[in-house]
Amino acid sequence: MNGPRYAHSNYGGNKGGPSNSTSGVFAGDIRCQVSNKSIMLISLKITNSPNSNSRGSSSSSSTSKSSSKTSFTQ
């Protein structure tokens, strides 16, 4: 039981741990920021197109403000 788990853990960790983890962290941060901005723009466009949904536009504006604050803090 301990042998295969140990081997698999070392293989996965040493094989793709350090390189993939570091690159994944940087790429993940950049992708998260870009995805958040694109989602904000898409949400604003969607809320602006249907003017009848006043509730949706108000909720989206509040969420976009909160997300912008979080992005600035980060």
UniProtKB/Swiss-Prot annotation:
<keyword id="KW-1133">Transmembrane helix</keyword>
<protein>
    <recommendedName>
        <fullName>Putative uncharacterized transmembrane protein DDB_G0290657</fullName>
    </recommendedName>
</protein>
<feature type="transmembrane region" description="Helical">
    <location>
        <begin position="34"/>
        <end position="50"/>
    </location>
</feature>
<feature type="region of interest" description="Disordered">
    <location>
        <begin position="46"/>
        <end position="74"/>
    </location>
</feature>
<keyword id="KW-0812">Transmembrane</keyword>
<feature type="compositionally biased region" description="Low complexity">
    <location>
        <begin position="47"/>
        <end position="74"/>
    </location>
</feature>
<feature type="region of interest" description="Disordered">
    <location>
        <begin position="1"/>
        <end position="26"/>
    </location>
</feature>
<keyword id="KW-0472">Membrane</keyword>
<dbReference type="GO" id="GO:0016020">
    <property type="term" value="C:membrane"/>
</dbReference>
